[in-house]
Amino acid sequence: SEALEMQKVAHETGRILSIGVCNRFGTAVNHIKDLIDAGELGEVYHVYASFRANRSIPGIGGDFTRKSASGGGTLIDWGVHYLDLILYCCGEPKPLTASGEAFCKLGKNIKDYVYTGMWAENTADMDGVYDVDDSVTGIIRTDGPTISFNGAWAENIGESETYIDFIGDKAGIRHQYCGGFVLYSVKNGMLLRSEPKFRSKDFYEEEINSFVDCVITREHNRADIDLAIATSKIMQAIYDSSELHREVVID
């Protein structure tokens, strides 16, 4: 609801509102988008994302894990970036329905949480509040590909996973989040694997430069609220679905 209100005010005032979805400015991400747009993957019918860690709950007990302050856990902290990246690369498909489950398991007993390192540990409060999701799973139907994901700040798994699979009927891509990608294809009766090499630009710098251009030209960029709002709607639908234990229609 807050994102929708921001969008409403931006429209009413004629202001440009860009959201901090920095992956839209990443070099690898834009190469992937170009390949999809050019039809190199054929029909991209499914996309899968995995963003899971063994123990990565940030600032446990503090604002990160207090729903009244953060709005949510893994899905809002990590999932937002994966989902937005997917929508961008796939040409902004319209989300139709979502089904998901959000779990509050490994961190809810704060003093029993075992870890070896913690991001933002200086904000942790062992007598604080933990009422957000530390793992989440979901599936989204769109008017393009289906999207499924598994995410976790903390799960009892051996190794962290941070990748996205774009699955097409001609080829597929595995993108290592904030890294490069591998293209899997078929040609002349052969299964091919290629790992493109390229020089990457700093996506934060590209994001800032793009916004400066918006200020000068008054034109909206690829991170405009009207594009980024879809991810907020998906996340809300996943949380609603988890509470209702059923699929939810996305307006």
PLM regions with names:
Residues E2, Q7-K8, E12, I16, ...:
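C-terminal helix-rich "cap/oligomerization" subdomain common to oxidoreductases
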Residues A3, A28-V29, Y82-L83, E205-N209, ...:
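A general structural signal for well-ordered alpha-helical segments in protein cores
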Residues L191-S200:
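C-terminal "lid/loop" region of Rossmann-like NAD(P)-dependent oxidoreductases
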